Amino acid sequence: MRLLFVLVLLITIKTFSWGQEYDYSKVDAIATFYSDQFRTTQEISNQIKKDFSKPQDQLRAAYTWVIRNIAYDPDEYLTYQFQYRILAERDAKLASTREDIIKRTIYDKKAVCEGYALALERICEELEINAYVVRGDVKRDVTDIGRPFSKNHMWIIAIVNNKPIIMDPTWGAGKYIESFHKEPSYAYYEVRPDHFLKTHYPAIFDDAYVDNPVSREAFSQWPLVIPEDIKLDAITPKKGIIKYKDLKNGMVVSLNFKPEKTLLYTFDDGVLREAEEMREGDAVSFTIRARSRTSRVVIYDGNKPLVAYLVN
C-alpha cells in the first residue's frame, strides 16, 4: 500500500476559536454561492455588506470567496519585479505594485501568497475590519526542517472582538503539486496560534500571538506535527532531523497520547509499515528501523499523518 505524504487536515463547518465555538454554517452556505464574476474588491465587499452585519460573519464570507475563486499560479512571482535607484522611487513602485497585485488577483482569479493576502486585506479594509498582512517562514515539507529562516510566505491576521483571527487563504485554497488542485478548506481559518506556529513563523514574533517565545532556530528544528490537537512536546524525538545511523540501529518513537487507529510509518518508498506498539495507559512507543537509505520518515495514525522527520 502506498500513500503520497501531504498535509491532510479536516475541513470543518464550525471553527473553534480558543475554546469557544462559533457557528459559521449560515455564512458558509451563502458565501459559497457568491458569484465568481466579481471583478473588484468593492463588488465583493458590497455583496458581503448586504448579507451580513457582524464582523466575524463578514470576515468569514470574505475568506470564503477568496479561497473558492483564486487559483494559485507560481508564474505570478515573475509578474511584478522592478528595479529602483532611490528609496522614494522604490516606495512609489511598491505602492503601485500593491494595487496592481490586488486588481490582478480579483480580475484574473490567480495569484501567489502575496495576492491572496493583499486581496483579502483590502476586502477587510472596505468592510472596516482591522486586518494586516504578515510575512514569514513556513514549513511545507520535511525538506524545510533545519534550513535557515526565510521570508517566503504571506498570510493575514484580522482583529475581531479584540481577538486575533489568524488565517492563510493561500493554503486554504488548495495545494500545488505540478499544477493547482482546488480544495477550499477552513483548516487554515481562525487557527489556534500554537498550532499555526508549527508551520508558520512570522518575521515579527509578536504576530504569533503565543505566550512563550520561540526562536527561529527552534522552529527550524521542529518536526512536522500535523494534527491541531497534538502538541510538540507530546512526541519524541522532539528534533525534526534524525541521523540515518540511528534509524538503522532502531529509533524509538514515543507518543504521549492514545492513537485512534493502528500506527503506521513510511520511508521514501511510500510503503506503509505497521508499527509494533508497546502501550502503557494512553502512551505508546515503538521502534522504527530502516534497512536502506531514506530521506524521511512519516508516521500515520491509520491514514492520517501525525508527524514527519528529515533523515540525514
PLM regions and their residue ranges:
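Residues embedded in well-ordered secondary-structure elements
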Residues: 51, 145-147, 244
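Secondary-structure boundary elements
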Residues: 20-109
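A generic alpha-helix surface/boundary motif
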Residues: 12, 39-43, 118
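Hydrophobic/aromatic-rich core segments of domains that either
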Residues: 115-196
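Alpha-helical and coiled-coil interaction segments, frequently adjacent to or embedded
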Residues: 177-312
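Bacterial Sec-dependent N-terminal signal peptides
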Residues: 1-22
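Active-site acidic/histidine clusters and adjacent loop/turn architecture
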Residues: 112
